[in-house]
Amino acid sequence: GFAAAGWPVRVATDAPCANAVAAALRGAGAAPAVGLDIVAGEGDVAASIAAVAAGWRAAGITHAIAIERCGRAADGAPYNMRGISVAGVTAPLDDLFTGGPWTRIGIGDGGNEVGMGKLPAALIAASVPNGAKIACVTPADHLVVCGVSNWGAYGLLTAMAALRPDLAPALRSTLTGAADRRILDTLVRDGPAGDPVAGARAASVDGYPHEVHAEVIARLDAALSS
């Protein structure tokens, strides 16, 4: 994707998610070229975030993209879609998202993700279960709302490939059904990670089997080629 296009890329997560994100990077063939920044889950979290932000500035990062990242609600806590606080296992990466000069892009599907503060809270409250409680208040400069967050990420890559045809082969290098399956299988096997919607450690995302996601990729590819 972006790294193959020659742009500086860093991936940030918190300690509870670090193993899973590292596995996804390996599955994508992005490790070790794409560095992984891990924000502490306890202790001086603010200092940990500040250190990562300083590293991003030094690396020349210009855009921060939050994908399916649970963010702060109005009461300051992050919530899952069931309205349960996940503050104990979720570092406030909102502060990294907003803590530098980068353009901020949020991608989400449930209203509780970083960037959803771009939308009126009343809209989220009226649109999803527990919306009034879980709506994230952290805004983005640009927001992509989608049925599944992965699809929004696919769409962003496809749109950039359309805008930069000279970089399209690089941007689309991991945007194939086979590559997506490899990432998912590595994530499930080595993360280990599962699908909370399916309630199982399975190669599915938000309850949809891989074949559904591969079809979305194929449709985006067809749209780009038409």
Where are the language model's segments positioned?
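Short, charged/polar "capping" segments at the starts of alpha-helices
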Residues: 17-22, 114-115
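Gly/Ala-rich phosphate-binding loop of Rossmann-like dinucleotide-binding domains
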Residues: 3
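Hydrophobic/aromatic beta-strand patches that form the interior of the parallel beta-sheet core
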Residues: 10, 37, 63, 103-107
